[in-house]
Amino acid sequence: MAEETLLTDDFLRQLMNIGEVDIVVGLSTHNNAKTIGPVVAAIQAGILKCFPRERAAIINVDGGSQDGTAELVTQASIDDLWRASKVYALRTLHSISVRYARTPDPSLALRMIFAAADLLRAKACVLIAPDSTTIDPDWLQRLVKPIYTDNFDLVCPIYHRQKFEGALMRNLLYPMTRSIYGSRIREPYATDFAASGRVATDFLGNGISELDWGRMGPEISVTIMAVTGKYRVCQALVGAKAHASRNSQDMVAVMRRTVGALFSSLDSNFAVWSAISGSEAIPIVGTEIAVAPENARVNRKRMLEMFATGVAELEPVLRSILSASVLAELQRIASLGIEEFEYPAELWTKTVFEFAASYHQSIINRDHIIQAMVPLYRGRSLTFLTENRDGPEENIEMRDESLCADFERLKPYLLEIWAERK
């Protein structure tokens, strides 16, 4: 059994009362009372509808919620679903909750869920974000079925996003992960995914979670482990993805968890990614699900202002991170008006690669490097919004592919500057 120390006596007792299962659905929560009820109901309905013969358990690991989240998970009644759907499970659906800390620790939470799946000998372990407000019961089937029927080890989602959603994924996480690790996974940092029992067990035993990038970005670390370890990976079309509104715009924290984890992963995986050229398609299962378009209102002038202010105020920091030519070009476009402004794809790609190399070399404090990247990302996001505001979604896909091609084409530039000292 992997990582026995993750299982407290109380947690272990609850798991032993369940016995072996086929499917574990993990929920890592922290003050999610406003959304957790519908999420649990959708999970229960998905198990009833799609896996009535399978033994299943919902396992909630809670990071110190003060709003009754854990109680809502364990008290969720499946009786109402039985009566409404007229579909009955042929096995008991278990639901347990354990508090692991007073503050959230996503890396520890993931390891605890995987340790539970390992102990229960689950064939599939599904992770669902507790604030996924658009989840429907069919998500379970779309994520789990490829593991059951086609022996895949990791199923990553492909979300149908509104036009201007997922800018960080489209402009940085996807193209860079694709160019670095050579796999076209559209959502490398997904909070909803399914892993085989093999992946869960191996993740616990390979020490990734003890590395900086494993602690910062546990979800993307599972993806990277899978693509570098030659596990069988596919992608499932799950439909729309939306989160409950957040106090969100702490973009520094978001980028630290995502971009910081990706940059950090390059250190320990250099021998792997430095030998990769181009990228390979990853199988996609399921059918596209239509989603009604929504009009998003964005303050473009404010975005330009944040970009220009960041370039000006952070000049000494940027000078230590970026080449003189890239910094000069950023200063030039920062002086442009809203109608003339453009942050070209090639300039953005070089910017990202120079930040990655400086992060590797720890030119300055790594957190400060990520913070300095935030206003530049806002500038690139402004160009993304401007380019796509009037066109159809097909144009966005074409531009996404073009940006990925730039990242792949310029990867030798990253290798060239990787070991240089500024």
For the regions a language model picked out, list residue spans one by one:
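N-proximal low-complexity "stem/linker" segments adjacent to membrane-targeting elements
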Residues: 1-45, 402, 412, 419-422
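Terminal low-complexity segments of carbohydrate-biosynthetic enzymes
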Residues: 259-422
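Active-site-proximal specificity loops/subdomain of glycosyltransferases
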Residues: 75-120
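A conserved acidic beta->alpha catalytic loop
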Residues: 62-71
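Conserved catalytic loops of nucleotide-sugar-dependent glycosyltransferases that act on lipid-linked
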Residues: 105, 165-264
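Conserved donor-nucleotide/metal-binding helix-loop-beta segment in metal-dependent transferases, i.e.
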Residues: 135-158
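Cell-envelope/extracellular polymer assembly enzymes that use nucleotide-activated donors
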Residues: 22-24, 57, 221
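Short beta-strand-to-loop acidic/aromatic patch adjacent to the donor-nucleotide binding site
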Residues: 113, 117, 121-133
